[in-house]
Amino acid sequence: MPDLLPLFVNLAGRRAVLVGGGPVAAGKLTQLVDAGAEVVVVSPDVCPDIARGGAPIERRPFRADDLDGAWLVVAAATPEVNREVAKAAEERRIFVNAVDDPANATAFLSGVIRRDGVTVAISTNGDAPGLTSLLREAMDALLPHDIGRWMEEARRVREAWKRDHVPMGARKPLLLETLNDLYHREREVSQP
């Protein structure tokens, strides 16, 4: 598989189709709803978490026309259904996350950390979801708990640079210096 392009997608208000009704599909539903997608679930049967998930449910087998108007589809059903969904998505040029089937996927939902305006995503290209989860937990522990303050400072400095027309090439070293100063000030305050 070629290297994947990490990409953050704005799904707010856009149609996403989730095919499948089990616990794995429920986890994907949560991710899609949290992203603001207008999710439609297609599955003859659904687990309680999907039933409570707030998305409309089409309680029937998948049909290719379920993908009409979709920006993204998640196939989280049986391997046979997932292949059918992936084929229909490919024909319509819609990205598909085919659970446990990286060969038929054109998109992967990554392990995600969201904290105070900062988002970190981790992927193993669909080959090792367990490792993705472990890496997400490790990265979460490494991120400063007050990263929101770092984000505020970076935003403030960026706006000032835009206003003052600071050249792009000069910004990175200046930002690193600013954030290092913030980090060291906070360490001095927190040490007895």
Each predicted region: which residue ranges?
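ADP-ribose/adenylate-binding Rossmann-like module
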Residues: L72-A77, N82-L109
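Hydrophobic, well-ordered beta-alpha structural blocks that scaffold small-molecule cofactor pockets
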Residues: M1-D45, I50-G53, I57-R60
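A structured beta-alpha segment of the ubiquitous adenosine-cofactor-binding alpha/beta core
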Residues: R60-D66, P79
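Short, ordered loop/turn segments at secondary-structure junctions
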Residues: P44-V46, F62, D100-N104, N125-G126
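A short, aliphatic-rich alpha-helical micro-motif
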Residues: L11, D66-D68
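Short basic, glycine-rich beta-strand/loop surfaces that mediate nucleic-acid
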Residues: W71-A77, A107-G126
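Residue-level detector of alpha-helix initiation sites
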Residues: P23-V24, E80, G126
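An accessory alpha-helical subdomain
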Residues: G126-P192
